[in-house]
């Protein structure tokens, strides 16, 4: 879950 802009270490991120 998340957006491409909010990618993290695992390639997933969250906006908020």
Curated annotation (Swiss-Prot):
NAD(+) binds at residues 14-15. Induction: Expression shows a diurnal pattern of oscillation across the 24-hour light-dark, with increased levels during the dark period (at protein level). Up-regulated in the early and late stationary growth phases as compared to the exponential growth phase. It is found in: Cytoplasm. This is Glyceraldehyde-3-phosphate dehydrogenase. It catalyses: D-glyceraldehyde 3-phosphate + phosphate + NAD(+) = (2R)-3-phospho-glyceroyl phosphate + NADH + H(+). Pathway: Carbohydrate degradation; glycolysis; pyruvate from D-glyceraldehyde 3-phosphate: step 1/5. One of its GO terms (cellular component) is cytoplasm. One of its GO terms (molecular function) is glyceraldehyde-3-phosphate dehydrogenase (NAD+) (phosphorylating) activity. Its EC number is 1.2.1.12. The keyword NAD applies.
